[in-house]
Amino acid sequence: MKIARFSTGDELRYGIVEGLPADEPYPSGESEGRLIVLRGDPLCTPPEATGEIVPLDGVRLVSPVIPRSKVVGVGANHAADGSRAGAAVPGGPVLFLKPNTAVIGPDAPIVLPAWSREVHYEGELAVVIGSPAKDVDAADAGRVILGYT
């Protein structure tokens, strides 16, 4: 299931994505992208459809999640990260924090501080935790993961 957060005006809502947007048609040329609108926040309650359906190309997609407090990042989680920076490879993952304001939507501008000269980019995978969790065993991790983005 693909859950999106979107706006059709001032109100932000969630929906289940079906199909593709108009600018990414199927090989046949069809585009049937739509959102089945959800009630509430699927991070807090199980997804429940309202019955409303809106076309995907008629909405503005925003950040898929609203981080409730912070983003916990994992740096140098493989040998190439450490060696690429010219530093010694750490014995394990290095954690770092980012403010929740660092999470933006697909078409939102990246706002840089005045002193910054460039944007560092790389592919990232975010694991969305769907319930409070601390010191979870690897074997039990699946029970607290809501999804990926």
How would you describe each model-predicted region?
Residues 68-149:
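Glycine-enriched loop-and-adjacent helix/strand subsegments that border the catalytic/binding cleft
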